[in-house]
């Protein structure tokens, strides 16, 4: 009973602090837009934000988190103007829920999944592992990090990959889960997991952390494509900065930044 009460109190505190944070940024300022961004895209959105703000007088406020949590927060009334999801399903669901503008959804990036095996390199050459080598190394790893498949599309892709390889049940007891792909990266980089699955863009964004490690560029046919969609929320229907950023995301300048970060588009 005590455990239940403590869990309930913790949940209430989390909701309280989230509410306080959103209350501070929720003012209807026509010169700013609040963008909810999936964790894998945080580093890239920072580059896009700088470029966008040099071209427009308005300001972007970035709120990061797992796709599942951001979706839940929007449903609970969080004042987010644009949702940059790591999947297609949740933006579509927001439209079905009547919270997003019909026809505003589009794919802004297609993610790539890689297997990361720290300290396993015998020389230079990232992404040099074969599928067979990766499977053998995974089987010899005591802890393998994946993002939560229920909250993070990269976690779902990782689970699907292991199922395709026939390894999910075998490795199940050794799997540790991060809430999002950022926490998964931290589990591996800190040594709390010997191997795991991250986004290609994370490896490119943190060369100092992964410079001597080995990778397998996952075969994209072994999991559902990680198509990442954006959608405009109804609260921002007349927000000029939100409208401008949605248009900017489709521009050649933005797409070049997104490609350089390790995404397809």
What do the predicted segments below correspond to?
Residues 1-6:
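N-terminal secretory signal peptides that target proteins for export/translocation
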Residues 8-10, 92:
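Composition-driven detection of intrinsically disordered, low-complexity segments
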Residues 11-22:
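Bacterial N-terminal signal peptides
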Residues 24-64, 68, 72-78, 87-88, ...:
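Exported/periplasmic ABC-transporter solute-binding proteins
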Residues 84:
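Short active-site segment of divalent metal-dependent hydrolases/proteases
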